[in-house]
UniProtKB/Swiss-Prot annotation:
Gene3D superfamilies: 1.10.1750.10, 1.10.8.60, 3.30.300.180, P-loop containing nucleotide triphosphate hydrolases. It is found in: Cytoplasm. InterPro entries: AAA+_ATPase (IPR003593), Chromosome_initiator_DnaA (IPR001957), Chromosome_initiator_DnaA-like (IPR020591), Chromosome_initiator_DnaA_CS (IPR018312), DnaA_C (IPR013159), DnaA_dom (IPR013317), DnaA_N_dom (IPR024633), DnaA_N_sf (IPR038454). Residues 1-90 are annotated as: Domain I, interacts with DnaA modulators. Keywords: ATP-binding, Cytoplasm, DNA replication, DNA-binding, Lipid-binding, Nucleotide-binding. Residues 91-141 are annotated as: Domain II. This is Chromosomal replication initiator protein DnaA. Belongs to the DnaA family. The gene is dnaA. GO terms for cellular component: cytoplasm; plasma membrane. Residues 359-478 are annotated as: Domain IV, binds dsDNA. It comes from Azotobacter vinelandii (strain DJ / ATCC BAA-1303). Plays an essential role in the initiation and regulation of chromosomal replication. ATP-DnaA binds to the origin of replication (oriC) to initiate formation of the DNA replication initiation complex once per cell cycle. Binds the DnaA box (a 9 base pair repeat at the origin) and separates the double-stranded (ds)DNA. Forms a right-handed helical filament on oriC DNA; dsDNA binds to the exterior of the filament while single-stranded (ss)DNA is stabiized in the filament's interior. GO terms for molecular function: ATP binding; ATP hydrolysis activity; DNA replication origin binding; lipid binding.
Amino acid sequence: MSVELWQQCVELLRDELPAQQFNTWIRPLQVEADGDELRVYAPNRFVLDWVNEKYLGRLLELLGERSEDVTPSVSLLIGSKRSSAPRAVQPASPPPAVVQAAPVAIEEASAARTVDAQPVAPATVRTERSVQVEGGLKHTSYLNRAFTFENFVEGKSNQLARAAAWQVADNPKHGYNPLFLYGGVGLGKTHLMHAVGNHLLKKNPNAKVVYLHSERFVADMVKALQLNAINEFKRFYRSVDALLIDDIQFFAKKERSQEEFFHTFNALLEGGQQVILTSDRYPKEIEGLEERLKSRFGWGLTVAVEPPELETRVAILMKKAEQTKVELPHDAAFFIAQRIRSNVRELEGALKRVIAHSHFTNHPITIELIRESLKDLLALQDKLVSIDNIQRTVAEYYKIKIADLLSKRRSRSVARPRQVAMALSKELTNHSLPEIGDSFGGRDHTTVLHACRKIAELRETDADIREDYKNLLRTLTT
């Protein structure tokens, strides 16, 4: 079997996966042919296990479809194709079912690796751009040039938001107006907003693009009232090509500011100018905000930005390490991503601490170094999210007793919440499958594994389960 055939199948898989998943898990693989067998090398155990569980089955299907009468034989190894004398190891979990494929050997090739962890301070460059309109009023729009579409890591949690933002940036005035992005802190809403502004200016350097926090809008209005210059204030904000306002929830209970923004908003939309807004919650849930504003925010497209899933968290860490010219091993990124789950800001903050610790101690980035540099943060995470806490939260959410989760009852009203609780325990704690099973009435690890896979399937097909899981995840991690 040829390497070229493998590469063809990899290219087909590339079309099926988000870019960051492909770059994180598939691109690092190396391959060489040995007669009818292909040897595929992963850089470490974490990549090997993940590829084996998530992607190898599909790759074998593609190989089987294109290798005619030859049954594809693939060995998955740890190391590189320059390594010699591979030694067999047992897989951490059974490989996925494949179609007409020979058993996959999972092996390990010894390969020494060193990490040169020299931190480079990330550049944060802001574009201070004065926008001037008739009447002489000037305003400096602080767009952060570091926030672009190119360095935004896309995943399931932000895929729709990113696509909508790109549509607005590439086709302003004819896309979604207004575009309303909402979600918790540190999830990428501001990044997308800056990315839109930067792209608009790249396409048209003379465009009047204004980015500001909602409190700045309030401060400008108050100052205009004090200076008896409210007409200039109105003229300025209603003449821009794109108005980008962050954290719109701060307009709550500010009646005069809401009144002025209401008329500004109407004028901009009537003039075909683009409006992008962000908030930490769905517009209908912003208390103290006038109903007419909530209604108008729904005229365009409202998109949620969710906390990133594990694959996206790993990709974010690898991307950040690449930007700062630090070599971050995959297993180290995986270790951090498994434990820091709440938002991107905390994830990047944890990575900065690890890089600094590596630099000051002159030691490479390893799991041991990460444990030491993040010991207070990891201890807090373990304290906040425990299996007991998950069981209590799930029981309250579904209005059942904790004893029901631990019982042998198999009715749907109990079995499904139990499976949800097991899946959350696997995602949010560091306990092994047997430990989780033992915490749920002495069940074995295969029951936990089945529950996790079942909930993963239902989250793709059942809107109610997907919403339940999202709500519980938010409750447990915020």
